[in-house]
């Protein structure tokens, strides 16, 4: 086992349900702790014992590969007993309600529940029924706090700061919990945020969240330090939000020409999974300015930091 992190940060919240409600100090503390875990994860011995004897349940009502795997790796590296539970193998398929599931799981005394659900607000409702700590791994189009934190860590490590940077968030903002969490975090940390996309994919009144709005990529990427592309979420669309994937790419997909509208040293991000040829082309996604793979690495470190920060609030911690 490796030595404990130098950071003594304790999150002043029992759960992590969203970025909303966190302070700038909370975010800085989590990012600092996560930075220590980045270095740990690059060593041969990646294990710590901070969650030894604790049970972590990953409860995913929506399919996930990278987020669920990231939380599983994070928990195991911290020494937790990790159980993965998907809706396809659960009693929810047999008619059990979300609250029944929460009460049933609570009777098994898990210490930490990591929950993803297709309905906005569902994770908060579940958190009211359990005694352990709950981490929101994405709820509908509401929030995805650990994604915003890992994005912030990625930006900070590459640009040295968040304050004063211009972040262009491009694409399907309307259906994106990633966009919402990032907007809240980046505003809180002093960055400028500009959302870019067709009017059909931008929430009405989004200016009230303190962002700039652009409806074409040339204007939207002008002066951008970071270009954050979003997946076109057709599974959440009930109508014709865009004419076709090819036409969408023509106007809003990121290629080398559109990337040239941003600053010369601009960096590219994407929360994944990527639809290559729809919101981003392979040359940019795999190019020298892309941080996509680094985001995945930062995700494990951030989730380790979140789990440890919450564990420090658990009884007998």
From Swiss-Prot:
Q: Which GO terms describe its molecular function?
A: amino acid binding; aspartate carbamoyltransferase activity
Name one matching Pfam family: OTCace_N
Q: Which reaction does it catalyse?
A: carbamoyl phosphate + L-aspartate = N-carbamoyl-L-aspartate + phosphate + H(+)
Q: Which GO biological process categories is it annotated with?
A: 'de novo' pyrimidine nucleobase biosynthetic process; 'de novo' UMP biosynthetic process; amino acid metabolic process
- Which positions bind carbamoyl phosphate? 66-67, 116, 144, 147, 272-273
The UniProt entry's coiled-coil ranges are: none
InterPro entries for this protein: Asp/Orn_carbamoyltranf_P-bd, Asp/Orn_carbamoylTrfase, Asp/Orn_carbamoylTrfase_sf, Asp_carbamoyltransf, Asp_carbamoyltransf_Asp/Orn-bd
Enzyme Commission identifier(s):
2.1.3.2
Which keywords belong to this entry? Pyrimidine biosynthesis, Transferase
In terms of Gene3D superfamilies, this protein maps to: Aspartate/ornithine carbamoyltransferase
Name the enzyme's class.
transferase
- Annotated binding of L-aspartate, by residue: 94, 177, 231
Q: Which HAMAP family match?
A: Asp_carb_tr
* Protein purpose: Catalyzes the condensation of carbamoyl phosphate and aspartate to form carbamoyl aspartate and inorganic phosphate, the committed step in the de novo pyrimidine nucleotide biosynthesis pathway.
Q: What subunit structure does UniProt give?
A: Heterododecamer (2C3:3R2) of six catalytic PyrB chains organized as two trimers (C3), and six regulatory PyrI chains organized as three dimers (R2).
Name under which the protein is recorded: Aspartate carbamoyltransferase catalytic subunit
The scientific name of the source species is Afipia carboxidovorans (strain ATCC 49405 / DSM 1227 / KCTC 32145 / OM5) (Oligotropha carboxidovorans)
Gene from which the chain derives: pyrB
